Amino acid sequence: TSGHLIRPNKTNRHIGPSLHINTYNYPGKARNYPHMIQPDYIFECSWEVCNKVGGIYTVLSTKARTLQQRFTDTIIFIGPDRGKPDADFREDPALYADWAKAAASEGLSVRKGRWQIPGTPPVILVDYQPFFEKKNEVYYEMWESFGVDSSKAYGDYDESCIFAYATGKTIESFYRFHGLEQKKIIAYFNEWMLGFGELYLQKYVPQIATVFTTHATSIGRSIAGNGKPLYGCMNGYDGNRMARELNMEAKHSVEKQAARYADCFTTVSDITATECRQLLDRAPDIVTPNGFEPDFVPVADAYPARRTEARKKLLRVAETLCGRTIDEDAFLIS
């Protein structure tokens, strides 16, 4: 994304200094917008910050250098503290040291440092484990305030949502400690896993502009993963009904409400915009295609060497797992 805040679907709402919102329709894709506001701080939050799980890690890590060049340490990534060493994270005790002490007095445990990716942006890792003892209170609050139904939660739902809740509290703490009330702030939340963080800020710090991005809807993934035709029968699907059928009610609920309440709801392609409109009952305000640095893809002359290097690494991993030597010309499927 460009780092500018687009404020659609709000009429005559004033949030913070000089943030006046006007209404205009979903355009289908990024074009020219009359209301582009340069933020003073951006908090980008994801389960995959310093946590290489899937494709969102690539999306975030490959845009960080450009964002860091543009915003120079006022773009702050927030991810989970998983309680173990991480090669992607280099701790810096001096970074935000005074705030971290204040946060600790509020019951927030964080580690601060630099994400070891191009641009080395500042990063805050949040210890969310202490909030598990308040899980039922958190779920009740989200039900009462936003209609999020966590009653049928299972799997990774608890861990993701409690981390997201802790992320919202962390942003609030940073915001109040540094007196950012007169600044233009964006909190950017990726995927349903961070929905509770967005909703927390909507309730307690509505001055902070929230962006919620889905890279693909949870129920859409489940439909496709269960062998059902997703795009061929898109117009016939009801998101709530499919969530009940596929036992996805909790994840679908938080994702749908996060999309509903976000100041700006985005997705990454026109086809996922159609998916959101049909399954989440809200069309994205803007489509923000994923972008990569120009040097992300090796130049043609470098391909053979990079391929050979990658193949050797795969063979070493395979040999370690199998406990035997594997021929160099083995056929690898990955």
Language-model region placement:
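Aromatic (phenylalanine/tyrosine) cluster motif
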Residues: Y24-Y26, Y33
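Composition-driven detection of intrinsically disordered, low-complexity segments
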Residues: H14-I15, P34
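Catalytic cores of nucleotide-sugar-dependent glycosyltransferases that transfer UDP/GDP/TDP-activated
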Residues: Y33-S334
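Alpha-helix boundary/capping motif
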Residues: K10-N12
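Short hydrophobic targeting helices and cationic amphipathic motifs
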Residues: L5, L19, Y26-P27
